[in-house]
């Protein structure tokens, strides 16, 4: 009997075309390291468990708060060139760099997410 592990869907809010290309390439090139995840680049993060949020884009935090209010099990990750010094959400600063992205708190987020299941 084989078990297929459910991939964790990663969505996005307001990411730039450059961010989307970078992240899609990371998921494609780092399939082994990111095998627990599936990235959905659409602007509809309703099904996502983890949401990458463009902190530099006006209005995305309001969208995130509405989304998180409807489903508090979702985990957000702020991406931006200027990030708050203190944030309840994990942060990833621009410019996005492969090593930083893979070694970011995403693994910790997955652990936290799986512990809550």
State where each predicted segment sits:
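A short, well-structured beta->alpha microelement
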Residues: 7, 14-68
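Acidic, contiguous N-terminal accessory segments
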Residues: 1-9
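Short amphipathic alpha-helical segments, especially helix-boundary/capping motifs
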Residues: 1, 39, 80-81
């Amino acid at each position: 009997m084989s078990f297929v592990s459910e991939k964790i869907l990663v969505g996005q809010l307001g990411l730039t075309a450059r961010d989307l290309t970078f992240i899609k390439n990371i998921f494609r090139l780092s399939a082994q390291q990111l095998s627990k995840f599936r990235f959905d680049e659409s602007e509809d993060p309703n099904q996502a468990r983890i949401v990458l949020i463009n902190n530099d884009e006006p209005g995305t935090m309001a969208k995130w708060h509405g989304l998180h209010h409807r489903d508090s099990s979702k985990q957000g990750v702020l991406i931006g060139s200027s990030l708050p010094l203190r944030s309840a959400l994990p942060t990833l600063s621009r410019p996005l760099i492969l090593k930083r992205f893979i070694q970011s708190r995403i693994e910790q987020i997955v652990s936290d997410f799986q512990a809550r299941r």
